């Protein structure tokens, strides 16, 4: 198998994948997207003879455009541009989950500060204001008072970028001090962990403590449905425990897994399982084009 790996920086996640691919004897072409040019009618030569391309772009904007180019070129890419589009934007993500009947936090979107403040007041305090594009828990705000709401909305309105004029307001979910991250391939869980913190944000990137987690049948069902809702692929599905059930608050398309790999230890070889799936996907693509 000849794999192309899109990157702008090789992180530990990519090193784990590269090591597993090379240990199996696969050819890997690393493609630094900062150096490439993408013509609307002809693919760059670096994509010739690749069986599959793995998108590991750090920047969401690059990921969205490059996967769209690869789809147009007919080059198999993980994940597809359709999946990337649905996962990269929290509004589209929430709409996809809701349409698929996946329990997800109640969310309202507004486009002016006045309308956003009305929505916040309707939710009551606390509620959550999130950027529509972003990761690692950045620029997320738990709003506890009207004064805080007015200040944060003013700051967002002043930031300038059009994405900050889309106010994504969500109910605050009382979770048991943790959430759950599941790495899945086409809806099948590979490994899962909890991320715990005394802070309301439990992201591993913000220092949340991780521990292996065993999924029950209900969680597995929701992971499968959430994956299908965005088109499948190599995904990170985030859930919160709500009473005896779960709510899915996000599906991630360029998922990091180094913290998960550490959390599960010897019980699951995460890069091994990912490459197993990648091999099967490349073989299926070859059969289709044969």
Predicted features by range, described:
Residues 2, 7-106:
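Conserved N-proximal alpha/beta basic substrate-recognition cap immediately N-terminal to
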Residues 142-228:
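Phosphate-binding site of ATP-dependent enzymes
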Residues 201-246, 272-290:
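A long amphipathic alpha-helix within ATP-dependent nucleotide-binding catalytic cores
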Residues 58-60, 133-134, 254:
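Short glycine-rich anion-binding loops that position phosphate/pyrophosphate groups of nucleotides
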Residues 127, 168, 183, 190-191, ...:
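Protein kinase-like catalytic core scaffold
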Residues 252-267:
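Glycine-rich phosphate/pyrophosphate-binding beta-alpha loops
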Residues 3, 7, 71-74, 84-168, ...:
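Active-site nucleotide/adenylate-binding loops and adjacent lid/helix of ATP-dependent enzymes
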């Amino acid at each position: 198998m000849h794999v192309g790996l899109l990157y702008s920086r090789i992180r530990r996640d990519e090193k784990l994948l590269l090591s597993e691919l090379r240990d199996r004897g696969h050819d890997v072409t690393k493609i630094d997207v900062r150096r490439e040019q993408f013509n609307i009618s002809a693919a760059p030569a670096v994509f010739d003879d690749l069986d599959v391309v793995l998108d590991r772009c750090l920047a969401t904007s690059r990921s969205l455009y490059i996967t769209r180019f690869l789809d147009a070129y007919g080059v198999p890419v993980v994940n597809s541009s359709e999946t990337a589009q649905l996962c990269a934007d929290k509004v589209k993500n929430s709409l996809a989950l809701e349409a698929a009947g996946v329990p997800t936090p109640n969310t309202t979107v507004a486009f002016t500060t006045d309308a956003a403040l009305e929505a916040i007041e309707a939710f009551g305090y606390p509620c959550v204001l999130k950027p529509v594009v972003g990761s690692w828990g950045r620029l997320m705000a738990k709003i506890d008072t009207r004064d805080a709401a007015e200040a944060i909305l003013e700051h967002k309105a002043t930031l300038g970028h059009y994405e900050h004029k889309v106010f994504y307001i969500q109910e605050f979910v009382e979770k048991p001090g943790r959430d759950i991250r599941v790495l899945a391939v086409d809806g099948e869980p590979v490994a899962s962990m909890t991320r715990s913190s005394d802070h309301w944000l439990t992201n591993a990137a913000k220092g949340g403590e991780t521990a292996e987690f065993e999924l029950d049948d209900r969680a597995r069902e929701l992971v499968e449905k959430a994956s299908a809702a965005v088109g499948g692929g190599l995904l990170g599905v985030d859930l919160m425990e709500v009473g005896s059930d779960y709510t899915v608050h996000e599906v991630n398309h360029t998922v990091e897994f180094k913290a998960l790999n550490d959390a599960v230890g010897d019980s699951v070889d995460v890069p091994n399982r990912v490459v197993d799936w990648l091999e099967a996907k490349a073989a299926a693509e070859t059969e289709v084009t044969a």
